């Protein structure tokens, strides 16, 4: 070893010892003929002092981020010079030798000062020398170990599944890989290990897990990555309760790493209730502000805007004092979300209603409105009217925006909830509008994925009452973030083919795309279910950072670009030729 001790391990009890340290020059200070450096390695920082004339002469060349090895004597710092801010603050190392292991060019940014994200990602290897980014990556390693410990204790088998496979429709676009030895054909990078983990259940593995890399060629979104990680699990001979129980045990182990005990059992809410009360299928329960159903209240209204299939409201405490400019800003905020605007009523301190909507209401409506929605004098009532789904979504977004503007969210709080019993299907147009890829050509597509089982008792309604079929599925939400989603799977070929048919995949197309899975279901497939946790999002929450990029060693930007390697990049003509990427497949001959 080039060093005898880790820099952050030295204490006053080590005084008098000769040590050798290796690391980076975090800071250099010159004081009256003596040079001090803060020597940093992965364990922490130790102050090194250069007094010996020969070593001092060498130390004059040191600059920030030089990589060095230093030998010397551990000494107690002079009285008054201790630094209680660092663990090694009682001691310093009086250097007797110095070796420069690697010089550093002038830094593109100072490691102890803020820097732009693109610059940080371009020089990510420097960014990771900083305390916070390094701590996030190290915590991620502990998170992996904690999850594995729980799963190993429950006899799960860690199994790797293929990362180049067949392109199968799963709700997003595939990344395609040309198959050089089969010109005109392509592999796909997996969007998830979904099909393989189900096949492992057919294979009798019974309990599988994997910390899996997944790939989705999605449109650019602010906090998405084209490659991401999930903790993937599957279990045979289980129901939803079994999967939820072990999931809660894993989550408890993860949050214990940061000293938080998750209250168990984690509460549950149905998808329908979540949408009705919070306007979101991933509600943030750190604050109240529930939506109020107003359709019945306005059933006889003469106000045309409220003559709609759904009318709902959310109350902004103290919002009546907002200036007109701010209220106009809410209209722009709503329009950016695809709405025409955000109707509002102001409740005056005397209880009188104001604002443009109030004058369109009947006397009875004005008299009863504040009581119906729970508004007090000085509050602002925001409304949405129209089809229920987009109207609730708008109010749900307004609810979150109100909470942020009023500081109602405790940043130290944790609020977990299971969202259960979602619909099995949604209109394909809704999925497309949300940026997903509808599987099949039918009017309906799967809310989760095509392999989710209907809730027991709903099998007969798949074709006849498609929109009201519930899924045997469960999502775990933390602080308004979906951090995991799972379901009991279809394990019968006949039901799987019926689900495919509703989604517009006829038997021939289903066999062409998923024939291997359908065939596997004919060989005694067991009932099975599982869950996948969004590993990047969970790590971001545990590290208390806003972006998942902070917990990925080498992330892409929001635009899918890697500033470090400048990927993606064009390939050469030779590579195009060798890969067969431009080969047009022969048209298939009729039989």
From Swiss-Prot:
SUPFAM superfamilies: Class II aaRS and biotin synthetases (SSF55681), GAD domain-like (SSF55261), Nucleic acid-binding proteins (SSF50249)
Enzymatic class: ligase
Biased composition (Basic and acidic residues): 574-591
Amino-acid positions noted as binding L-aspartate in the UniProt annotation, renumbered to this chain: 170, 216, 448, 489
GO MF terms, alphabetically ordered: aspartate-tRNA ligase activity; aspartate-tRNA(Asn) ligase activity; ATP binding; nucleic acid binding
Enzymatic reactions: tRNA(Asx) + L-aspartate + ATP = L-aspartyl-tRNA(Asx) + AMP + diphosphate
InterPro entries found in the cross-reference section: Aa-tRNA-synt_II, aa-tRNA-synth_II, aa-tRNA-synth_II/BPL/LPL, Asp-tRNA-ligase_1, Asp-tRNA-ligase_1_N, Asp/Asn-tRNA-synth_IIb, AspRS_core, GAD-like_sf
Marked site: Important for tRNA non-discrimination: 31, 80
NCBIfam families, per the entry: aspS_bact, PRK00476.1
Family to which this protein belongs: Belongs to the class-II aminoacyl-tRNA synthetase family. Type 1 subfamily.
UniProt-listed HAMAP family: Asp_tRNA_synth_type1
Protein name: Aspartate--tRNA(Asp/Asn) ligase
Organism: Mycobacterium avium (strain 104)
Species lineage: Bacteria, Bacillati, Actinomycetota, Actinomycetes, Mycobacteriales
